[in-house]
UniProtKB/Swiss-Prot annotation:
<keyword id="KW-0963">Cytoplasm</keyword>
<dbReference type="Pfam" id="PF03129">
    <property type="entry name" value="HGTP_anticodon"/>
</dbReference>
<dbReference type="InterPro" id="IPR015807">
    <property type="entry name" value="His-tRNA-ligase"/>
</dbReference>
<dbReference type="Pfam" id="PF13393">
    <property type="entry name" value="tRNA-synt_His"/>
</dbReference>
<keyword id="KW-0067">ATP-binding</keyword>
<dbReference type="InterPro" id="IPR036621">
    <property type="entry name" value="Anticodon-bd_dom_sf"/>
</dbReference>
<dbReference type="GO" id="GO:0005524">
    <property type="term" value="F:ATP binding"/>
</dbReference>
<dbReference type="GO" id="GO:0006427">
    <property type="term" value="P:histidyl-tRNA aminoacylation"/>
</dbReference>
<comment type="subunit">
    <text>Homodimer.</text>
</comment>
<dbReference type="InterPro" id="IPR004516">
    <property type="entry name" value="HisRS/HisZ"/>
</dbReference>
<keyword id="KW-0030">Aminoacyl-tRNA synthetase</keyword>
<dbReference type="InterPro" id="IPR006195">
    <property type="entry name" value="aa-tRNA-synth_II"/>
</dbReference>
<dbReference type="GO" id="GO:0004821">
    <property type="term" value="F:histidine-tRNA ligase activity"/>
</dbReference>
<comment type="similarity">
    <text>Belongs to the class-II aminoacyl-tRNA synthetase family.</text>
</comment>
<dbReference type="InterPro" id="IPR041715">
    <property type="entry name" value="HisRS-like_core"/>
</dbReference>
<keyword id="KW-0547">Nucleotide-binding</keyword>
<dbReference type="GO" id="GO:0005737">
    <property type="term" value="C:cytoplasm"/>
</dbReference>
Length: 411
């Protein structure tokens, strides 16, 4: 019989992969808490309109990648392809637009139908941070600083470069869009098929092209910096000043536009050279219209998301897990005492496992297999004396001690 396999583009996260995944989440959760973020959990599926209307009808995610289906009531629902839209929906649904700003951390699975490749899956996992209700560029810098600190504490920050850009406000984007279309229209016949479509529907997305010839044409294209109105230029200058105050290095990259249509002003990506062409490990930007599009009042916001699988791949080593203590009763008569000792150790925060089966040799082999740091041996003589034998497995040293002293001996 053929063994069942996970669906293409999905994976089982177990063993070393699970430890790496857990380490990324716990590090991000702890650092986000230092910035005042509260953790939210939103549903993994939403009404399709939450994504289709708000991510941009021309975005690749909406046009090509969403897992959308009708439920048994005929309602169109979609497995979430990203986290920001759901968080903004939750803010409005729960009446939290009057208690701003809100800083939100989230983590969990996302779903996109795209070609699986290194570090990219159809079910993947993200961590994310949103700061909603803050209109100042300092909020953008603080969100970026949080992302930078997470990368640093994971030990991967030194190999990653922060790229920033501004998309300006609506007036600035309109002026830039006109200049960009005027320029690219002269070379329309040379553009890739995808960029020809984008030239009509969403010209700024051409800046995100991966086509080599498109990139060549863009080298001489107008830059948005020349089309910013005073307010947008001041916002961008404020962002750069705040990043410098945080001690965060960055490069300006006029091609950073991100994949969703809800962004304005700030767009940024942390890029690694260790993951090939798809090198972005954390990215985001400002979205000042998204909450209003969800039915809430005009509410500014800024945030980012990062792929857990991709960050886990960058870790230099698998995080160590606490080495347990193996509790080994020599016979059935000692099992009750073994259970009592297991309970005592675990309540004291010491990882402990029991080795019940086989002879003493097999039980010690199991203790070594689970990488136990010590074994607590309980025989009939020790039981009668209210004692145990503590064996240190790295060096084989052992000694008898009263049960009452076991916790202190194990530290």
């Amino acid at each position: 019989m053929t063994k069942p396999q996970p669906v293409r583009g999905t994976q089982d996260i177990i063993g070393e992969d699970a430890r790496r995944h857990h380490h990324v989440v716990e590090t991000a959760r702890r650092v986000a808490g230092l910035y005042g973020a509260a953790e939210w959990a939103t549903p993994v599926f939403e009404l399709t309109s939450v994504f289709a209307r708000n991510l941009g009808e021309t975005s690749d995610v909406v046009t090509k990648e969403m897992y959308t289906f009708e439920d048994r009531s005929g309602e169109s629902v979609t497995l979430r392809p990203e986290g920001t839209a759901g968080v903004c929906r939750a803010l409005v649904s729960n009446g939290l637009t009057q208690t701003l700003p809100q800083k939100i951390f989230y983590q969990g699975p996302m779903f996109r139908y795209e070609r699986p490749q290194k570090g990219r899956y159809r079910q993947f996992h993200q961590i994310g941070l949103e700061i909603i209700g803050a209109a100042e560029p300092l909020a953008d810098a603080e969100a970026i600083a949080c992302g930078q600190q997470i990368l640093d504490e994971l030990g991967v920050g030194a190999s990653i470069t922060l790229h920033i850009n501004t998309l300006g406000d609506r007036d600035s984007r309109d002026a830039y869009r006109t200049a960009l279309v005027d320029y690219l229209s002269r070379y329309e016949s040379e553009l890739s098929d995808e960029s020809k479509v984008r030239l009509v529907k969403n010209p700024l997305r051409i800046l995100d092209t991966k086509d080599a010839n498109d990139i060549r044409l863009l080298a001489e294209a107008p830059r948005i910096y020349d089309h910013l109105n005073p307010a947008s230029a001041a916002f961008y200058d404020g962002l750069k000043a705040a990043l410098s105050a945080f001690g965060i290095a960055f490069v300006e990259n006029p091609r950073i536009v991100r994949g969703f249509d809800y962004y304005n002003h700030t767009a940024f990506e942390f890029v690694s050279t260790a993951l090939g062409a798809q090198g972005t490990v954390l990215g985001g930007g400002r979205y000042d219209q998204l909450v209003e599009q969800m039915g809430g009042p005009p509410t500014p916001g800024v945030g980012w998301a990062a792929g857990i699988e991709r960050l886990a791949m960058l870790l230099a080593a698998t995080p160590a897990t606490p080495r347990p203590v193996a509790v080994i009763p020599m016979g059935e008569a000692e099992q009750t005492a073994a259970i009592e000792i297991l309970a005592t150790l675990r309540r004291a925060g010491i990882a402990a496992e029991a080795a019940y089966r086989g002879n003493l040799k097999k039980r010690l082999e199991r203790a070594n297999r689970i990488n136990a740091r010590a074994a607590v041996l309980i025989g009939a003589d020790e039981l009668a004396r209210g004692a145990v034998t503590l064996k240190t497995l790295d060096d084989g040293a052992q000694r008898e001690l009263p049960r009452a002293e076991l916790l202190a001996a194990l530290g």
